[in-house]
A protein has these predicted regions:
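Amphipathic alpha-helical dimerization/coiled-coil segments
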Residues: 1-19, 41, 89-120
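N-terminal helix-turn-helix DNA-binding core of bacterial DNA-binding proteins
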Residues: 18-57, 79-91
Length: 120
C-alpha cells in the first residue's frame, strides 16, 4: 500500500498503482494519444475514419486500438458491417485537459522567461 501522490490521506493498494502504470504506459505513445484525442473529439469512429483523419495506415491504427481496447481505455461497438470505437474510460477527458493545460502554462512561462528553458 502506498499513499496517493495527490491526496496523501488516501491509501492506494499496490495493485491499483500497477494498473495506473499500465495505463500510463499505454498513453506514452504519441500515435495512441492522437487516436484518443480524436475519439474524445469525434467519437465513435471507424478504423478507416481514424486512419484518414490522422494520415496513418489502417493496420497501424488497428494495432493501437487493440492495445487501447485491451487496456480498457476504448471500446468497440458493431454497427451493421462496421466497427466503431469510442473512449470508455471516464477520466480520459479530464486527464487530457489537465495535461494540455499544464503544457500551455509551461509554454507561456517559458516564453516570458526564456532563460528557464535553457536551464532545463
Amino acid at each position: 500500500m502506498r499513499k496517493c501522490c495527490y491526496a496523501r490521506r488516501v491509501t492506494v493498494p499496490d495493485s491499483l498503482i500497477d494498473e495506473a502504470a499500465r495505463r500510463f504506459a499505454l498513453l506514452s505513445d504519441p500515435t495512441r494519444l492522437r487516436i484518443l484525442a480524436l475519439l474524445l473529439e469525434r467519437e465513435p469512429m471507424t478504423v478507416t475514419e481514424l486512419s484518414d483523419s490522422l494520415g496513418i495506415a489502417a493496420p497501424n491504427v488497428s494495432q493501437h486500438l487493440a492495445r487501447l481496447s485491451a487496456g480498457r481505455l476504448v471500446g468497440r461497438e458493431k454497427q451493421g458491417r462496421s466497427v466503431r470505437y469510442r473512449t470508455i474510460e471516464p477520466s480520459l477527458h479530464s486527464l487530457c485537459e489537465l495535461m494540455c493545460s499544464a503544457l500551455v502554462e509551461q509554454a507561456e512561462r517559458l516564453s516570458v522567461h526564456p532563460s528557464r528553458a535553457r536551464a532545463g
